[in-house]
């Protein structure tokens, strides 16, 4: 029996009935979306203690280890020593161009160059996923492998091969750190409410910084000491060099790996109500202008961030300038200034975190820039160990405030679905300047001296300060007024 309804008997809906049906479907969709948002919020608060502990342990142990590598003392000094003794194979003309200062700048630039592209590629691979933890663990593991490679290179290589290996591992470290930063910050943004992010970062950085400051001093004074690299000994038929820098890097690898393990075991990640559809990297790059036009505050924030990072061209040369002025670049000197830098970084975290939670991170961003300018001026005026100690303390506090403020402010602009790509674009802009900055700084130092590098740095920080004061509104205030979606 044919039950097909003849065309002339098919009921035709009036425009009013169609509108009512669409309105009903829209209301149902909005109800489902509201229910999903409520479930998402309930999951976050129900698992807050566990996720808080996971982020705390990961930050305390992970950042402790990374600070041993990223402190403006060990790696610049190590590269300077290697470049001073490992460039003999070059022709005389090239040796004049490849000065130790230029090699220091090149090494720090290579560490940053990976962050130019890898954040966007990483974000494109995770923004469509409801769970990003597996990608975070993979990127974190690959990042730590590079630090292990730096350690083994120092034990088994010497001279030019060791210098080349260090430059390679610094490049790979930057490559994986760019993608890791996006993934881990995205997890933080998903599991920790914005009203708790400041104090979490404050306490994890504070406790981790205490450990890092103590380890930095101990590594400089006792592990590296006065003779960081010695003649090889034989172990299992292999020639192994005693290298205090390698031992320090291996210690950093162990600490960061413990933090990553704790994070993987404890974290509980929710499924967000909405995610972006998967898109090609080229399509996301074409979407950058639209993303910036849709949020003027974020666009100017990225400009300010770029200028602030450009001001870091001087960072690798702080310790070299202090060593040249004091006529000492010994392990003890590295340990003392590393202690000042990381100690102030540690102590100031409580200020930055609680200030950010209470007033928003725009205020801490501004104060950090003022600290940076003041610390650089003090460094220029210093001629004694106590004065340099104070200058490194100011610079450490500034670095801490900038990192916490910039990374947290990015999470508070715009829509949640765009968070991964905002992190990626922000990291890429930072990576461009971070990769070019030390290289340009090294060339300036080789041609015009350290002071010109410092004056250039101050100029960029002043520009960043002006942009934030006059062009960037506190994103949390806009969110509370309903201009952006949570």
State what each model feature region is:
Residues 152-169, 380-391:
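Helix-loop junctions at membrane interfaces in 12-TM secondary transporters
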Residues 30-117, 122, 126, 136-140, ...:
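Helix-loop boundary and gating motifs at the non-cytosolic
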Residues 118-131, 223, 347-360, 445:
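Helix-to-loop junctions at the C-terminal end of transmembrane segments
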Residues 101-102, 194-204, 331-332, 416-427:
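Loop-to-transmembrane helix entry/capping segments in MFS-fold secondary transporters
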Residues 30-49, 269-303, 483-486:
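Juxtamembrane intracellular "pre-TM" segments in multi-pass secondary transporters
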Residues 245, 260-277, 469-482:
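Helix-loop junctions on the cytosolic side of multi-pass membrane transporters
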């Amino acid at each position: 029996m044919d039950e097909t309804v003849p065309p002339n008997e098919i009921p035709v809906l009036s425009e009013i009935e169609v509108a009512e049906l669409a309105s009903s479907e829209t209301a149902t969709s909005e109800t489902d979306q509201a229910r999903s948002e409520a479930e998402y919020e309930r999951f976050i608060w129900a698992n807050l203690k566990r996720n808080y502990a996971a982020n705390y342990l990961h930050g305390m142990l992970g950042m402790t280890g990374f600070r041993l590598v990223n402190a403006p003392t060990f790696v610049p000094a190590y590269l300077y020593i290697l470049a001073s003794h490992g460039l003999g194979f070059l022709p005389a003309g090239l040796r004049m161009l490849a000065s130790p200062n230029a090699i220091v700048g090149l090494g720090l630039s290579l560490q940053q160059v990976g962050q130019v592209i890898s954040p966007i590629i990483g974000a494109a691979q995770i923004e469509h996923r409801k769970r990003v933890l597996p990608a975070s663990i993979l990127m974190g593991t690959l990042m730590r492998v590079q630090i292990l490679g730096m350690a083994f290179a120092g034990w088994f290589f010497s001279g030019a091969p060791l210098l080349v290996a260090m430059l390679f591992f610094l490049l790979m470290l930057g490559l994986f750190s760019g993608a890791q930063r996006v993934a881990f910050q995205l997890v933080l943004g998903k599991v920790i409410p914005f009203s708790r992010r400041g104090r979490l970062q404050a306490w994890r950085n504070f406790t981790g910084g205490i450990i890092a400051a103590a380890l930095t001093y101990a590594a400089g004074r006792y592990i590296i000491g006065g003779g960081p690299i010695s003649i090889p000994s034989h172990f299992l038929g292999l020639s192994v060099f005693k290298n205090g820098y390698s031992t320090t890097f291996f210690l950093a690898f162990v600490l960061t790996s413990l933090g990553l393990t704790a994070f993987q075991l404890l974290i509980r990640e929710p499924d967000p109500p909405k995610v972006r559809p998967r898109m090609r990297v080229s399509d996301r790059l074409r979407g950058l202008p639209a993303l910036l036009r849709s949020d003027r505050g974020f666009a100017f924030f990225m400009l300010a961030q770029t200028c602030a990072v450009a001001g870091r061209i001087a960072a690798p040369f702080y310790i070299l300038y202090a060593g040249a002025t004091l006529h000492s670049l010994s392990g003890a000197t590295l340990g003392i200034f590393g202690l000042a830098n990381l100690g102030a970084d540690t102590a100031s975290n409580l200020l930055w975190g609680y200030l950010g939670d209470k007033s928003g991170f725009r205020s801490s961003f501004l104060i950090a820039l003022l600290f940076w300018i003041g610390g650089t001026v003090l460094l220029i005026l210093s001629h004694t160990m106590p004065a340099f100690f104070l200058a490194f303390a100011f610079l450490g506090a500034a670095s801490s405030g900038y990192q916490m403020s910039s990374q947290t402010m990015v999470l508070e602009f715009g829509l949640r679905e765009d968070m991964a790509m905002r992190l990626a674009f922000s990291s890429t802009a930072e990576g461009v300047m971070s990769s070019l900055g030390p290289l340009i700084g090294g060339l300036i130092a080789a041609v015009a001296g350290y002071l010109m590098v410092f004056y250039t740095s101050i100029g960029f920080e002043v520009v960043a300060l002006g942009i934030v004061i006059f062009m960037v509104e506190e994103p949390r205030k806009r969110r509370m007024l309903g201009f952006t979606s949570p």
